[in-house]
Regions:
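Walker B catalytic acidic pair
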Residues: 20
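C-terminal regions of RecA-like/P-loop NTPase motor modules
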Residues: 1-16, 44-49, 61-145
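Flexible beta-alpha connector loops of hexameric P-loop NTPases
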Residues: 25-36, 63-72
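A short alpha/beta connector and helix-capping loop motif
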Residues: 29-45, 88
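Conserved H-loop
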Residues: 55-58
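Residue-level detector of anion-binding/catalytic polar loops
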Residues: 52
């Protein structure tokens, strides 16, 4: 599909976002092998066509973390972390079920973005860097102090 798109359009794509990698067909026995193979192929495609590829993956969390705690690379492994140049995470402290409603309301627009993996290895801002989230537009912006 990506190769056909690249051939059909004069203006090359600069960014490709894939929301659900597991929906792409691959012929392997295991889901993990399928995802790892697709991740490698996407990385090669990205280099050959000089295009950024972003793969989104929603982490399934247990009841202990309803989306309010920082992530680490062991959360929701899906097979392509090893191939990724960067792994980003995000969470919303207001999702914490143990805080009172007033605190939850005060944190409603708080979203934390994490760099869990970079090209040089470890993460940056493991607790997440605070950003402003607009629930009406879905836009995330940096908080300036």
């Amino acid at each position: 599909v990506l190769e056909k798109y690249a051939e059909l359009h004069e203006q090359p794509a600069r960014l490709i976002c894939i929301d659900y990698l597991e929906l792409i067909r691959a012929y392997t026995d295991s889901q993990m092998a399928k995802v790892q193979g697709l991740a490698r192929e996407l990385k090669v495609f990205s280099r050959e066509h000089d295009v950024a590829v972003v793969v989104l993956h929603q982490v399934k969390r247990g009841e202990a973390n309803a989306g309010h705690k920082p992530l680490d690379l062991t959360d929701g492994k899906f097979g392509s972390e090893e191939s990724a140049d960067f792994v980003l995470g995000m969470y919303r402290p207001s999702m914490n079920p143990t805080i009172n409603q007033d605190l939850r309301d005060s944190l409603d627009n708080d979203i934390r973005l994490q760099f869990l993996k970079t090209r040089t290895g470890g993460g940056i801002h493991p607790e997440g860097k605070q950003h402003y989230w607009n629930g009406d537009t879905g836009r995330i912006s940096e908080i300036r102090f």
